[in-house]
Amino acid sequence: MKINFLTLFPRYFEPLINESIIKKAVDKKILEFNVVDFRDFTKSKHRKVDDEIYGGGHGLLLQVEPIDLALDSLENRGGYKILVTPQGKIFDQKMANKLAKYDQITLISGRYEGFDERVTYLVDEEISIGDYVLTGGELPAMVIADSICRLVPGVIKKESVENDSFQNEGLLDYPQYTRPREYKNMKVPEVLFNGNHKEISEWKLKAQLEKTKKNRPDILERIKNEK
């Protein structure tokens, strides 16, 4: 899979690309990244990529032309194109599973007051990572990319993906423990030591349901409505 990032701050993406599991996948040529500074495509002699808002409003908007020209520079115009914006659909695991099937994805990160609305005509989808505001789209773009990359075959073990939170009916993960067996009167549940795989599986599912009910009751409500 190839992922393009269109941004005004290319160095933001270095930790994602150059560390840990994703770097190993890059070295194995399972993943490929291309970071593009769309400021390089402005026709302004001052390298300006934003301007005042028609009709009034605070701040400056990112112009459509530099982004359009940056997309023109990409192979097959960047594959499936995503605008990272607070106005987009909320990103979730189902979306990650869908996006992981593409050969090439482009994530466009904004700044300032956002994008000229005509940028939305250039993309396939608008995505948000939540109902809150950040200083720019780079961090959300990396969140989306990280979530997608780990689903690409060969990046991590298949078993790890299958056991993730949100993969099993969308439920949160069950509690997990390691040594020591007891710490400051906090004990690991005895069922995990009895060797009865059926009982352990039942405990895990019950624990998933309890944790999901406690922390994300909206997920249970959604699952109920889908059935």
UniProtKB/Swiss-Prot annotation:
Keywords of the record, alphabetical order, are: Cytoplasm, Methyltransferase, S-adenosyl-L-methionine, Transferase, tRNA processing
Pfam families noted in UniProt: tRNA_m1G_MT
Gene Ontology MF term list:
tRNA (guanine(37)-N1)-methyltransferase activity
Give a GO cellular-component term: cytosol
| InterPro entries (UniProt xref) | Alpha/beta_knot_MTases (IPR029028), tRNA_m1G_MeTrfase_C_sf (IPR023148), tRNA_m1G_MeTrfase_TrmD (IPR002649), tRNA_m1G_MTases_N (IPR029026), tRNA_MeTrfase_TRMD/TRM10 (IPR016009)
Residues bound to S-adenosyl-L-methionine are G110, I129, G130, D131, Y132, V133, L134
Which reaction(s) does its UniProt entry say it catalyses? guanosine(37) in tRNA + S-adenosyl-L-methionine = N(1)-methylguanosine(37) in tRNA + S-adenosyl-L-homocysteine + H(+)
Q: Which residues form the signal peptide?
A: none
User: What superkingdom does the record give?
Assistant: Bacteria
Q: Tell me the compartments it is located in.
A: Cytoplasm
Q: Name the Enzyme Commission number(s) assigned to this protein.
A: 2.1.1.228
In the record, biological process GO terms are: tRNA N1-guanine methylation
Gene3D superfamilies in alphabetical order: 3.40.1280.10, tRNA(m1g37)methyltransferase, domain 2
**What is the top EC class of this enzyme, as a single word?**
transferase
Primary localization: cytoplasm
Similarity comment:
Belongs to the RNA methyltransferase TrmD family.
Query: What is this protein for, i.e. what is its function?
Result: Specifically methylates guanosine-37 in various tRNAs.
Q: How does it assemble?
A: Homodimer.
Name of the protein in question: tRNA (guanine-N(1)-)-methyltransferase
The protein's organism comes out as: Mycoplasmopsis synoviae (strain 53) (Mycoplasma synoviae)
Gene responsible for this protein: trmD
